[in-house]
Amino acid sequence: MYSLMKKIITEKDIKRQVSLVELLLNHSQITVNELAEVVNTTERTIFSDLQTIKTQLPKGWLINSDQSGIQLKNEQNLLTNELWEIFLTQSISVQLLKELLTIKEVATPTFLARNGLSYETLNRHVKKLNQQLVVYELQIEQNRHRLSFSGEEETIRLFYHRLLMPFTHNNYFFEDYSIHESHYFRFLKRLRQAELAVDTEEVFGICWFFINTIRIKAGCRIPTSLFSTQDQLFLLYAPELEKLYRTEGVYLKDKEAAFAFSCFLDSWNYNNSYPPMILDILHRHSAETNIREFVNRLSESLAIKELEQTNLPENLILLLLKYYESPLLIEQTTKQYHYYLKEYEQEYPELYPHKFALLQQVKESTSMVKKVTNETYFFYLLSLLIQQTLLAVQPYQATIYFIFQGEPSWKAFLQQELNAYLGKRVILEPIELSQLSDITIKKNDLLVSNIPIDTPPMPVIYLSTIPTKNELDRLSDLSLRSYL
């Protein structure tokens, strides 16, 4: 959750301590050895860092340790942001980014005086920070007079959105966030009254509203339009968005209005429940015919007729509307989801020609404001939406054949419990040993038995008549390939 924030912390000790606090928050109990392994340091360093953290904890927080491990306790149900206020404010890079959000340029002498730094020390921190920002096509420009961002304004805002989203809804960084939040909830209420409401990620949308108003007030304007102001969806929502931004004294015009709408659209959920008016606009999208044909081809190729009755066409149209390439989004998608999507591609290699054909049609479309230039990124997003739909209509992924000799009532009970234990992606099918040779084996199929089987045709997991915890854990581990 805090991976981007940890990347931009330039002090090694603070970054390590923030990682430790995060681990302690996420685990009810954890050992020093486990902490050292995750943070990639020595146990001695962990002990030293824990002592430093203990001395800085706010009132109501404490660290307990015993033979079982270490616990971070909160005795008064306090907000975790109290911890971030202490540790993140010690980072020079975090403080610099915080100031550059609200102002176009930071006066170097003022920043040095406020943080008790020499120019040489600041220079070292900026160089380290720029090494992390370069992959996002951002840099901090620095001289003895001023500090400022170098990069596209859209990229700067997206970077801040992803950086701050885990923190801002609990008022970290800015105490007036709750005011923006109340304005945004009234905006959503007006949409419901006008029958324009859709399912959205509320924190996602509020954080966009928050950042956009701050950047506009700082005089940092969007230079290009990311969305057509003639689009029917834009024309529907623009009046309410203009009202929303006026609550913060911001008057949306042209490019800023288009960007504000694209940010609101960014918060829309897939598998949405659209009002009739919105659904009608989506179905009149210029790519709708190509997308319908694409879904029909998938349905025929996989012999899954139900695909045609799913939300996949609307999801793909929303993907095209929301589509935006940035180094930050591309890095997050390709690195975080790489393994899972690689498994998916191996499972459905026959779908690639259909996806490639759709991509070519999309690239040739004159209605696409945001063009597809990174094909890998587009395919990753496309694959996630297709796979989610496939698993919704056909959750079954593997069969576990169950050969069991024992008292029939116990066998029936055990079969029922194993079925529930394995979940709906796995089919537990009881068979007799004599039927094994007649089975058509598919990928991921397993055999579970409490008797020895000579030359089994598939992997076997042996269970005791009354299965042990270790046996069940092994069965669960092997069957989890059918899940995320």
Where are these regions (language model features)?
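A cross-family "folded-core" feature that marks the main globular domain of proteins
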Residues: 2-484
